[in-house]
């Protein structure tokens, strides 16, 4: 809910105090997930897979573009970011979060209902962002939607990610 609240704020209210809802929501999701992990029978190989998904997810959400522009900036000058993973699809975080939660099931016995619920809620959030919030709060987003697929990368997007 915090992440959705942050999106509504970006598109409609523009209140400075609500700009950090997304990163705070992400931290709370991580904490809720950590509380559900079973550390008694850890699978090392799946831990490595989970770690890889987590690192890429963190990069996609907080490292591939300016965190200040994405999560702090209040003016209407935010522009679409269409490089790297965002050349593959408009919401690469959805794919990596789903991969993370699936791998956490095998690594730490995270219950499947938790993994499915968090992944489904993330997909719903991305759908709302894509349809209602990002076109209102990120300049150039409508054009970006015409060029880059929602979730499933195309061969053109895969080629684009390797361009310098």
Describe the function of each predicted region.
Residues 93:
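Active-site His/Glu-centered metal-binding helix of metallohydrolases
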């Amino acid at each position: 809910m915090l992440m959705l609240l942050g999106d509504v704020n970006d598109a409609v209210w523009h209140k400075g105090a609500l700009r950090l809802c997304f990163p705070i929501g992400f931290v709370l999701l991580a904490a809720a997930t950590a509380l559900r992990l079973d550390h008694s029978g850890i699978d090392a190989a799946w831990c490595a897979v989970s770690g890889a998904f987590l690192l890429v997810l963190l990069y996609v959400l907080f490292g591939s573009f300016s965190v200040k522009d994405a999560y702090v900036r209040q003016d209407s000058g935010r522009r679409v970011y269409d490089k790297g993973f965002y050349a593959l699809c408009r919401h690469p975080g959805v794919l990596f979060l789903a991969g993370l939660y699936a791998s956490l099931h095998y690594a730490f016995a995270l219950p499947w209902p938790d993994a499915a619920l968090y992944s489904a809620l993330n997909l719903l959030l991305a759908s709302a962002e894509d349809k209602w919030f990002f076109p209102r709060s990120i300049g150039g987003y409508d054009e970006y939607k015409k060029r880059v697929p929602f979730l499933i990368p195309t061969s053109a997007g895969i080629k684009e990610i390797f361009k310098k």
